[in-house]
Structure formats: structure tokens, C-alpha cells
Amino acid sequence: MRDVLGKSASDKAGESWEISGVEGDISMVQNGFLEGNSLQELTEIYMGDLLGDSIYQRFGVEFPLLLKFIDAADFLSVQVHPDDKLARERHNSYGKTEMWYIVESDQGQLIAGFNRELDREQYLQHLQEGKLKEILNYEKVAPGDIYFMPAGRVHAIGAGVLLAEIQQTSDVTYRIYDWDRTDNQGNPRELHTELALDAIDFSFHKNYKTDYQALENSTVNAVDSPFFTTSVIHLDKPVEKDYNLIDSFVIYMCMEGAVGIAYGKGEVETMKKGETVLIPAELKNLALIPTEASTLLEVYLK
């Protein structure tokens, strides 16, 4: 996290919450005349000008996305998230659909879904017999790989994987398996076996990785879902961006290089690898000016 992304974090830090409206972990403005204000305060003051009118009507002052970097030193727990309907019924919360963009991978892997057709009873049998690992789908990953994880898909991040995560604003997680780890007192971590049963999507897919074609100086759509739209932009020269046809804020996450964001009357905001910038919905035209070969993720809502 510190060496690759330049984060001022300890060696043991596993996550960097880049843009968050989650209570207790709300993002703060880092520069400009609004420096020191929270994202919550900005949504309350600027409403549709910041979020987009249609987004504000849907979510109010609650920021709808949470963006992170995650650096896994060991395999994280196998987990699943409920969809909106189940999360609302149980937790009065949104569900959690998310996506991962692999920044670096030291020969790492992740888990996405199952490796065969399954039903609820077969899943439970493997779980009860301690054979869950046999039915999980393991994927070797490389920088630039994208995985879309809809609510209901079991998943886990493996050791040596550094990734960017884009998700609905929700902290509801059902832990299924934690590799038989124990705490200092020898106690296993709490699992949510029963809660997870109604949340899991048992369907099998031949290909869990998102296919997209990387093109220079073009905006390539990779994920288009009801919860967020994410595109990949590879830059080696300036690119003009026009957002007049969308009614949403835009977020850039810099995966590689460094980029100037030019807007207004000559203003320029710079960002480098590991940094994240929120563009308000009222800003419809800007230019992306790379100072070296760069890669951005572009995120917004429809």
C-alpha cells in the first residue's frame, strides 16, 4: 500500500478508503476553499450540483458508492453480500455489489463464485464436511484484470493481490469461511453460515473475469450495472471529456502514471497513482492531460 500507491500507512494496513460516506469513516476534502469539509457536508450543501439531480433524488445526502484500495497479505475470508432486497429486510441497508481492478499481483489469486453447478443442499454438504475449498473457483490474476462481483457471489482476495474496489455504500458482509484461523485465545472467527444461505447465488459461470479491450486514449466501458458504471482510460496524450449526457458525479481512480485534470478557466487538478478524485455533477467538460503513460478508472451512476 505504501510502496506501490504512496499511502502514508503502516506495513500492516490492508485497506485505504478513498471516497466514503460510511458513518464514522466519511471522506474529507483535501484542498481548495472547501478543504476540511466532509463529504456529508458537501452533499447536504450542494445536493444535486454535486451528486446529480437524479442521484440526489434516489439517495438523498447518502453518498451511494464506497471506493477502496485493498492489499491482501494473506487470503481474506470467503464471504458473500446480500442484495438490496435482503439487506433492506434484515439490516435496513443497501446490498453490496462490487467490482475489483487488479493493480498488482505477486502471483496471487482470488476466489470468484463456484467451480461447478451447485444447489443449496450440495453446498451445505461440502460446508459441513469441511470441503468448501473443493467447490470454490480460484482465479490467477494479473494487473489490469477486472472482476465484477454482484451481490450473492461468494468471493475472497488472495495473498499478494493489490486491487481497487468499487462498491455500493454498504458494510453488510456474511463470512462463510476463514481458513480455520484462530485468535490469540484459540477462538475461531465468527461465521455467518445461516445468514449467508439466503444470500448466496449458487449459479455457475464458465468465465468470471470481465472481458474488455484496452485501447489507448479511449474510454473503454468495462462494467455497466444498475449500481455503477466503470470504464478504463489508458492515456498517453490529452483527452477531452464531455459529461453533458450523464446526470451524475464522476470519480477518477489513478491506477498508473499521473494526470492533470484541466477545467474551468485554466484550473488544473493533478492526480497520481493511488489517488482518487471526485468530479461534481455540475462540471460537464474537462480535459485529462497525462504527464506520462497513465491509466484511470472512470466511475459514475446512471
Specify the residue positions occupied by each region the protein language model found.
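Transition-metal
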Residues: 1-118, 178-206, 230
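Ligand-binding loop in jelly-roll beta-barrel domains
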Residues: 62, 70-75, 84, 105-107, ...
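His/acidic/aromatic-lined binding-pocket segments of jelly-roll/cupin-type domains
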Residues: 67-68, 76, 98-101, 138-139, ...
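Short beta-strand segments in beta-sandwich/barrel cores
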Residues: 108, 240-241, 257-262, 276
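Double-stranded beta-helix
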Residues: 112-134, 164-207, 292-302
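Short, basic/aromatic beta-hairpin or loop at an interaction surface
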Residues: 117-129, 247-260
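Short acidic-glycine-tyrosine-enriched beta hairpin
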Residues: 136-148, 263-283
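C-terminal amphipathic alpha-helical segment
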Residues: 174-246
